[in-house]
Amino acid sequence: IGFIDQYQPEYVVILSGDHIYKMDYAAMLRYHEQMEADCTIAVRTVPLAEASRFGIMNTREDGSIYEFEEKPKHPTSTNASLGIYIFKWSVLKKFLIEDEENPRSENDFGKNVIPAILNEGYRLFAYEFQGYWKDVGTISSLWEANMDLLGKNPAFNLYGEKGNRIYARNYAMPSSIIARESKNKNCFIAEGCEIYGTITHSIISTGCTVDSGAIVEDSVIMPNVHIESGAIIRHAIIGEDCRICRGAVIGGSFAPGEEKKISVV
């Protein structure tokens, strides 16, 4: 609280760290100001079968929230919180202090803080977000989000929009070497790689080496991985700095409609 107080902000944006999306926060802030809200929560409609994974809210026609429950066992709505909030700082500060002083509180944002603000009659509004959004809190959803970057018309497109910057801690690396004998289709290859094998529908992160005769399909390869000749990787996530030895087989294929079980190394 002291850190934020030194900037004396009127509003504070609270975000989750395991979600993938692109959003213009300025547009959400304009909505927040227009509705004279104390708190605005980004929402989207989810299937009822998945609603128990999210904070679920009921809203009036004007978008105001009159009910909020974190991960309900029996959800009464499909309006799911995306973990993106804008608060009046004075309001958030008050309830954070009160929550910390409450010995019965679990100190949980969704279970305690948001319901407390709502119960005291403050103005909470839902801001509907239509774009791509994915919670990558599971292995399968992390794999799916990476696969969504691929293809001619990807579900999550990193290109084609001016002004969108990607901030990362990657070191500056040389251009990748893509050997003439390599076979690559529908893949994303970052800088600093040496590619001699076959890669299909996969993400190859910085500094990776794929030797001649190695096969990578439908997989996510984290930075600085070396995949030796003859290794076969399918439907897998390989952690950074791994070495996949010659002839190793990781993962497999799935029948249509079969649940995808992603291998992890």
What are the language-model segments listed below?
Residues 90, 98-265:
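Left-handed beta-helix
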Residues 1-149, 257-263:
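Unchanged
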